[in-house]
């Protein structure tokens, strides 16, 4: 039973992260951190649901996203921003956790925000991505926005692009964080129809990753009966641009 399988994954995530989704009352206090992995896990433990933060709601609503993601996307008020060993200051932050096929945390992704948009940090990035895997291994993983096992599932690169696709097409969507991880993504066995929502990149990174994913799923995931490819018609855009600006979308289907 695939729903039972998802439930087992949730137990693994809860055991590792340390709280029950939807019930912060039972959230344990962060333990003493001995490694970067521990520090990141503790950071996630200190976060709060997005619905409890006006700043988080404003950030997503400014992007046309009103269905707030739950589960593995949360909020941290006034998180320290470090540039190497220098403390630059504090900013509110959206923290998300990408998990692998076994439900284990693989990456923590942090977006620093200010005044309803990404924080302006000069030439320093407003986003940071931290691996939780040993020895630099890059596992197949994604950010899950809800506890469900849908037969029709979409996958996109960035979090905002994935949530925008979900908003437009009312299809449960996951985010892989970048093109490299999109290429390596594999859908769970309960998925019968996979939508690949790719970025229309100037240098073709998003399109290339999407095509490689389509080929891999067609060859190695016999449980997937249909693949739907969708991308913005305008170069240099993603599905958040489609949502906000009503851009046209190119669609192609593959059926087994």
What are these regions (language model features)?
Residues 1-8, 75-78, 241-254:
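Short, small/acidic-rich helices and loops at N termini and domain boundaries
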Residues 66-89:
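Short, basic/aromatic recognition patches
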Residues 150-151, 159, 163-256:
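TOPRIM fold recognition
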Residues 73, 143, 239:
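Short clusters of hydrophobic/aromatic residues that line enzyme substrate/ligand-binding pockets
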Residues 1-63, 225:
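Non-catalytic accessory segments of DNA primases and related replication-initiation nucleases
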Residues 6, 64-65, 169, 221:
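A broad structural signal for alpha-helix termini and local helix breaks/kinks
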Residues 82-190:
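Phosphate-handling DNA/RNA-contact segment within nucleic-acid enzymes
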């Amino acid at each position: 039973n695939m729903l039972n399988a998802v439930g087992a994954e949730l137990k693994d995530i809860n055991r590792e992260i340390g709280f029950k989704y939807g019930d912060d009352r039972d959230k344990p206090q962060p333990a003493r951190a001995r490694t970067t992995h521990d520090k990141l896990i503790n950071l996630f433990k200190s976060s709060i649901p997005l619905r409890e933060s006006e700043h988080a709601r404003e950030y997503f609503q400014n992007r046309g996203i009103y269905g707030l993601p739950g589960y593995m996307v949360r909020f941290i008020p006034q998180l320290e921003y470090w540039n190497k060993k220098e403390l630059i200051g504090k900013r509110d932050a959206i923290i998300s956790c990408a998990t692998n096929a076994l439900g284990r945390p693989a990456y923590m992704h942090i977006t620093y925000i200010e005044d309803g948009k990404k924080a302006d940090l000069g030439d320093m990035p407003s986003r940071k991505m931290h691996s939780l895997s040993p020895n630099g291994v890059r596992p197949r993983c994604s950010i899950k926005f809800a506890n469900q096992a849908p037969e029709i599932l979409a996958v996109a690169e960035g979090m905002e692009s994935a949530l925008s696709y979900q908003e437009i097409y009312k299809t449960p969507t996951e985010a892989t964080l970048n093109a490299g991880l999109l290429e390596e993504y594999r859908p769970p066995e309960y998925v019968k129809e996979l939508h690949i929502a790719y970025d229309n990149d100037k240098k073709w990174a998003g399109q290339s990753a999407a095509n490689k994913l389509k080929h891999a799923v067609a060859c190695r995931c016999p449980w997937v009966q249909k693949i739907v490819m969708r991308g913005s018609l305008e170069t240099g855009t993603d599905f958040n641009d489609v949502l906000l600006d009503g851009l046209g979308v190119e669609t192609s289907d593959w059926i087994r």
